[in-house]
């Protein structure tokens, strides 16, 4: 899956999970600071990404995923 395809899928999931417009979800968008996620939203978002991409994101790795771009990069690495 290309980086662009991953970004589009992540953007769609983030928009749905956080009830924001997909246009607001940019690679440098911080889940908490820019998109209004709280800690529970972040946990639910990680679970949705795990399911959508059929990967496992350990807690230690999840703590390092603060932006949409971080999520895309992590998923890209897991799929290569």
Curated annotation (Swiss-Prot):
In-chain residues carrying the UniProt-annotated modification O-(pantetheine 4'-phosphoryl)serine: 39
UniProtKB keywords: Cytoplasm, Fatty acid biosynthesis, Fatty acid metabolism, Lipid biosynthesis, Lipid metabolism, Phosphopantetheine, Phosphoprotein
Protein's pathway: Lipid metabolism; fatty acid biosynthesis
Entry-linked SUPFAM superfamilies: ACP-like (SSF47336)
Subcellular location, record wording: Cytoplasm
SMART domains for the chain: PKS_PP
GO molecular function, one term: acyl binding
Gene Ontology CC terms: cytosol; membrane
Family annotation (NCBIfam families): acyl_carrier, PRK00982.1-2, PRK00982.1-3, PRK00982.1-4, PRK00982.1-5, PRK12449.1
Protein name: Acyl carrier protein
Protein source organism: Prochlorococcus marinus (strain NATL2A)
Phylogenetic lineage: Bacteria, Bacillati, Cyanobacteriota, Cyanophyceae, Synechococcales
Gene: acpP
